[in-house]
Amino acid sequence: MLHTTVTQLIGQTPVMSIDVPGRNATLVLKIEKNNPGGSMKDRMARSMVIAALQDGRLPPGGTIVESSSGNTGTGLALAALEFGLRFIAVVDHHAAPDKIRMMRALGAEIRYVEGDFREDEVAVVERQRLAAQLGAQLPGALFMNQSDNPANPEGYTGLVDELVAQLPDGIDAFVGCVGTGGSMTGISQRLKRNNPAVRTIAVEPAGSIVFGKPGHPYYQSGTGTPAGDEVGKVLDYGCIDEGVQVTDTQAFETARYIARRKGLLVGGSTGGAIYKALEFIGAGKLTGTVVTTVADGGEKYLGTIFDEEWMAKRRLLDPAIAAQLDGWLFGKARAA
């Protein structure tokens, strides 16, 4: 098929299996980093823009404003190009530099929030405030507000339909990251509609407040809800069977491990989801076909989580994680 716009390339991403010997389980990765903007957020960005244009909230030639750590912003930049819109991304120091460079390359205007923030502090509240202000003040502008936008979870309908077609023997469990809650809600609701017995496990960073734990700073980007922010209205707790936390070290060391053992560069949040999926499989809590998404690629984090000096300076290295992963995947520890 010959495509004529870049957003037509969104979806139909491949799947890759990782066998877990002796556990009656296979971990399946949905390679969402293969979307044109490099992440699964392309799906919901397109969904939100189309919905806003159709219901008149966003006029032709208008301006999209959104608070983003980068992936949603990249997806919105692509959609803005296709539909002839202006896009302003409101970011903070926590966003990966390469994500900001990518948004700029696609024509997005970047606005930084001002403030004295710790390096591991996510300034979501300040980003949301500035984005809402710009959306209200600029003529023809709309603050997309992905955390409360129903078109966010609706954007993942196609992902589940693809999985059902790709895995005809069925899906037994889904392990996904939770940030705004859009992908976790959209995927989990549709999976359970197809099969109510599917187990759904939501993973947030240690320090995130989605499941009521005390909040503190964390380095994982584009996932979780930091202290001081409110959990998004799109998150449907009713479709989630269990919420768990993963540390920065567990998430980042797993991403590095997958790169070196499987040749697949995944982002830090994906590393966290893979770690928890394997932990649950190793403990016998999940069996059968267990799916998670490669939400974005590690190519955006080569200067951070894949950089030895960056990791060491922040005391995030722990070779015991690789040994633990070897134990789950090979039944024994190997040299990291």
Curated annotation (Swiss-Prot):
Pyridoxal 5'-phosphate binds at N71, G179, T180, G181, G182, S183, S269. GO terms for molecular function: cysteine synthase activity. Keywords: Amino-acid biosynthesis, Cysteine biosynthesis, Plasmid, Pyridoxal phosphate, Transferase. InterPro entries: Cys_Synth/Cystath_Beta-Synth, P-phosphate_BS, TrpB-like_PALP, TrpB-like_PALP_sf. It comes from the Bacteria. The modification N6-(pyridoxal phosphate)lysine is found at K41. The keyword Transferase applies. Its cofactor is pyridoxal 5'-phosphate. As it is highly similar to bacterial and plant cysteine synthases, it is possible that it catalyzes a related reaction. This is Putative cysteine synthase. It comes from Sinorhizobium fredii (strain NBRC 101917 / NGR234).
